[in-house]
Amino acid sequence: SLPNGPRNRVWNTGSGKAEFTIHPIPHIELADDQYLMATVRSHDQYNTTIYGLDDRYRGIYGERRVVMMNPQDIADAGFTEGQIVDLTSHFEDGERHAPRFVIVRQDVPRRCVFTYFPEANPLVPARSVARLSNTPTSKSVVISMRPAE
């Protein structure tokens, strides 16, 4: 088998032990009608290659244009499960829009929503990137939603 330091409990660090770095999570102010969106993969997906429309991890079948929401957030916003909504992201350089996402009830943290990528990629601001890696901040996008037109 290939060498695997952690599996063999070998840590190539100055201390000879596993070392962890802790990064504080920035506080993001959300307006009353805003949520923090993270994009995720489905079970039938490898990176951006999509093999099917089913996500057995989350019990979602036959659809990928979904916004997964906390049940209490759905009720508080006056939405219903299965309702079709348009999503808008908000960043310093303007707004981006992605139409016709289906609300799906999931056990996610309050004021946070999950969407699949690449379907929600248009909402991710190209200029919003991680400081060191320069990768898009796809796990931290401020959005709002309204009933679909």
Could you say what each language-model-derived stretch is?
Residues 48, 53-149:
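Long, contiguous, secondary-structure-rich segments that constitute the structural scaffold
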Residues 1-56:
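Long, low-complexity segments enriched in small/aliphatic residues
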